[in-house]
Amino acid sequence: MVAATDFVTKLNAAIEAGQSVPDIISADTTKVLNYYPNIPCNDVTDLVDQIDEERPYLQASYEGTKIDDKYYYVPFYSSSTLMFVRKDKLEEAGITEMPTTWDEVFKDAEKVSDPDNDFYGLAIGCGENDDDDENTIRQYMWNEGGYLFDEDGNVAADDKVTAVFDKYAELYDDKVIPQDATTWDAGGNNGSYLAGRTAFCFNAPTLYNALVSDEQYKDLLDNTVVLAPPAGSDNSVYMNFNRGFAVMNTCKDTDLASDVISYLLDKDWYDSYMEEIAPVFAPVFEDAKENTTWKDNEVNAQALKYVENASGYYGYPVKTLKGRTVAAKHYFTYPFVKAVNQVATGTADSAGALKSMTSAIEDFQDQV
């Protein structure tokens, strides 16, 4: 076994040396694209299509894992980002229905904010490497019709993107967002929620597991509703977090590797396995919608709802292989969340932050 923190380093070393390369690896789109232009994974399109014919994939998982009309890994499961809501705080403010749009979330968050008592509506940070909240803000941007790239891979950020910067800064200035949120890392949002400081938090279902597994959070759990994220004025596209299995191009028996992956997708075994790891990961097949594990449990159902709508990806809606690669690789330099941070902290206005972000992405684009 290899620790997750060591996996990529050891895999890269094996690939470079041409020795001890695994036949099958756990993969996702970002991991695959980071090897462009020398992607070391086989094209497994035929296997994915065969699986889809026998047991149809959710459309978002089927389309969202395709790279330049090919599959470099077989989709297996997906994580999600769910909305955790303090229902007791909403009730105290006279709010009787859960919000379904971003505008409603922001309005409700403003109503429940009480900064004098260190309570805030939104747990959305913009620290320098806060990838969790960058994904949330990016998704909000998509939902409002804003994009960093066009389909051809050109940087296409416009006034819809600056509107997102300005909205975040407005919420921050109005103290709907904690004032330390500009320094958060990826754990800042869920940390604030667990500490009872925030009413709305967008996080993986691991936050739900933390609430369930620790007795100290019993009251917080009882007052928490877990939902799929809201829709925007333009769409309700979610970021996809599909993962699966890739066959390396050094594999000497690709037929056997395909058989192993097919075995792991055997319906009975797969369904029982997914039941054990719910709701942190959700299935990627259409028939999951009729499975009681994912239909009758409210939190599991919301996780599956997320996966059903998770057709977005880094760079969405770019279609080209190089464009997808630039988007996937630039993500790890965080120019987007840095721009949000600049506007929130007043070190740049939205136009200046947009210009700086665009320049950073274009410089990176030239290196790919």
List each model region and its residues.
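C-terminal lobe and pocket-closing loops
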Residues: 206-220, 233-335, 366
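Short glycine- and hydrophobic/aromatic-rich loop-to-beta-strand nucleating segment
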Residues: 81-85, 141, 245-247
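Glycine-centered hinge/linker elements that transmit conformational signals in sensory
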Residues: 108-109, 152-182, 225, 229
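Extracytoplasmic "Venus flytrap"/periplasmic binding protein-like
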Residues: 1-57, 91-100, 192, 196-200, ...
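Hinge/lid segment of periplasmic solute-binding proteins
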Residues: 28-80, 106, 132-136, 160, ...
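Extracytoplasmic/periplasmic solute-binding protein
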Residues: 70-76, 81, 103-154, 198
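Beta->alpha turn/N-cap motifs
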Residues: 27-31, 186, 203-211
